[in-house]
Structures are given as structure tokens and as C-alpha cells.
Amino acid sequence: MAKKLYIETHGCQMNEYDSSRMVDLLGEHQALEVTARAEDADVILLNTCSIRERAQDRVYSQLGRWRELKLANPDMVIAVGGCVASQEGAAIRDRAPYVDVVFGPQTLHRLPEMIDAARISKLPQVDVSFPEIEKFDHLPEPRIDGPSAYVSVMEGCSKYCTFCVVPYTRGEEVSRPFDDVIAEIIHLAENGVREVTLLGQNVNGYRGLTHDGRLADLAELIRVVAAVDGIDRIRYTTSHPLEFSDSLIQAHAEVPELVKHLHLPVQSGSDRILAAMKRNHTALEYKSKLRKLRAAVPGICISSDFIVGFPGETEKDFEQTMKLIADVGFDFSYSFVYSQRPGTPAADLADDTPEELKKERLNALQHRLNQQGFEISRQMVGSVQRILVTDYSKKDPGELQGRTENNRIVNFRCDNPTLIGQFADVHIDAAQPHSLRGSLIQ
């Protein structure tokens, strides 16, 4: 009987991508098959996130729940990867001594041998080092799971924002070779993928070495990806405003496969807070780049990230953030209350905003963003949108769902499952808080 793998993923799209590659790797090297039940597993993997305090707490809560499974089945291997593993290393075993393997984002390619070593030696295996992009040389071809796919083009970040753990948990920026990225995307396209999302912690800082020794930027990569037969849509995330270049704006204007949506995290609308965060740009500089983009691509939708309650944030600082939200017209954001992350420069600052006030500000910010996003959705009612049909609707098996160019989910009634993986024209009938309803145009 085949051995079983249970995997749980916390955090960002990069973690989702890494988890999919772990499944590929362990399927090829150890013939492990994925199970939906941890109690049935021979190997349990937890791919962790350390961006937020609660995400880190979740790790130890989850490991605590698996302790009984390990006691019942001592041969079970429990492995912890991702950014919490990178940050804490062997110290994870101080709180969860039944963990067998601890590995970082850059050493996931060593997972099969680490699992084997743990089984044979009965000793814990820990490797949270930062070998430069080596993991991609050891991974099998990616498994295809639907018409959309993530492709990691770079790892790490060298910006060292004062609130962020990424440079310490994933290392500094390292770009994958240009031809390696294109080869992976060709493989995906040959197997039915129609949309790719290019991933990196600072993806628009991509500088990939080409076969002739040049460094290609993200704009050049996008143009070549768009020329791959079968690829009809391109997205990328996550970007830093400093790296949002004129060449990228030109690519948005000239490459029809590049969607009319940009996720460009700003974190705050206050220049004082932006300086304290070491973002190295002002709110005006951020808005100026978006004005150029919108002049080149009218109608493009912009989403962002915000941190509320950063140390020293005053009411005036928060009002400036709310003004930026209104000025730009963001339609969505990943927004969080600030929490101290150990080892970051901001952790040395006084976290002096009361938690209740942080929550009030976060609620006000999210309410404003929800209003703006719904208004954009409402304006789409009556239009015809070309959507990539990705799956059955999560709420009604008699419906299919897909995404618009500007990243909105559309649900529509359809009894033809062969549309999944294809593009379809859908008339938008109604706007809902977090999705659209439509009718298939036959």
C-alpha cells in the first residue's frame, strides 16, 4: 500500500508554490501520495509563515495537535519547513521535541534525504541554510493542477524594511536564470496551463542571467513569457514600488497578455511612517508611478498591502493613509495590524499604539477599501468579461467560476465542465461583496 503525505501550508503564494514542489519531490523520490487526513499520513509536512505573530503561534498550536498522532505512530515523520523553520531552526524542537525534520525555504530540495536520515538514524535533521537558488536544480518538473500556475522566478529580498523578516528567513534576492524560468513555463503551457503568476518576494527586482551573459529584467521576462504558445494571461506578485520601472509600465501598455491588475504594496500613506519602515519612497512618489501607469493603461485596477499601528503612528499618519487610499482608488488590500517580529529593527521600537485603537483603524481602513472595491465591481455590471474558467463554484456545484483580468471571481450557471481550463465570455449580471455573478454568452 502506498505511503501517505499530509501537507498543511500557511502564508503567501510563495509558500503555496513551495508546497506544490514538495509534493512533486516526495512523489517522485518516495512515491508518497497526498492524503487529506493527517491521521492517515506516514509523513506530515507543515510549511510555515512568520510574517505575522498569529501565523507563528499557529505553528505551535498545530504541532501540539499532532503530538498525539506521533505518540500513536512513532514511525510517522513530522517535518516543519518555511519561514518559521528558517527563523527558529533547531529551537523548534525545544517546544515540539517530536518534530523529526526542520528545513528552510532554500533547502526543501533536501527533504527526501532528510526524511530518510531521520528514519534510519532516529535523530533530528535540521538544515535552514541559504544555498543560492540551488533547490531549483534538484526539483522535478512541476505537477499540473488546473489552468493557472505559479512560477517562482526569484527568492529572498534585499530591501530590509524595518518590519519584515523575509531577508532573514529567505535570504537576499537571488534570481533564477532566465532560460530556466522560460523552460518551466513552456512545460506548463504544453500541459494545459493558460495563465501563469510570476512569483518573488520582490518580483519586479528580477534580474535573470540569460544564455548570452546579460541580465534580463522582469519586463523582458514578461515579453518572452507572452510569446510562449498557449500562455494567454500573465500576472506577477509581489512588487516593491522602488523597482516599479518605466520598462514595466511600457510592458503593461504593450503586452496584451499582462492583466489589467497590479498588486503594489505601499504599507502606509504617511511619509514619516514610510521613512521609519525604510521603504525609501514617499507617498507622492508612489502616486506618481501609478499616474504614469494609468496614463498608459486606463482602467487598470490597483491593490496593495497596509500595516496599521506601526510604532509611532499618530492619528494624522493614519489619516494620510486613508487619504492615499481615496486618492489612488485601491480596490483591495491585504491589511494587518502591526505585530513585532523578533530580529527586525522595528522590534526595538516602542509598540505604543493601543491594540484597540489599532483594530479600530484597521476596521475603518478595510471598510473604505470594501466600499471602493464594491463600487468598481458595480461599475462592471452590464459589461461582458473574458474570464478564465478555473473550477466549479465553491458554493454551488451547478455553477462554474473563473477570474476576470482585474482579478475578480465570477460565478455563473453552466452544465458544461469541459469549459474548465478555457476562456469564456460572461455577461456580468450583479456585483456582490467579494465576487460577481454572470451569465455565459453562448
From Swiss-Prot:
Pfam families, per this entry? Radical_SAM, TRAM, UPF0004
Note on cofactor? Binds 2 [4Fe-4S] clusters. One cluster is coordinated with 3 cysteines and an exchangeable S-adenosyl-L-methionine.
| GO cellular component assignments | cytosol
Which residue intervals define the domain Radical SAM core in the entry?
Answer: 143-375
The residues that the entry says bind [4Fe-4S] cluster 1 are: C12, C49, C83
- EC? 2.8.4.3
Kindly list the places in or outside the cell where this protein is found, as annotated in its UniProt entry. Cytoplasm
Q: Keyword Translocase, does the record have it?
A: no
Family statement drawn from the similarity comment of this UniProt entry: Belongs to the methylthiotransferase family. MiaB subfamily.
Protein's name in the database: tRNA-2-methylthio-N(6)-dimethylallyladenosine synthase
Q: Write down the species.
A: Pseudomonas fluorescens (strain Pf0-1)
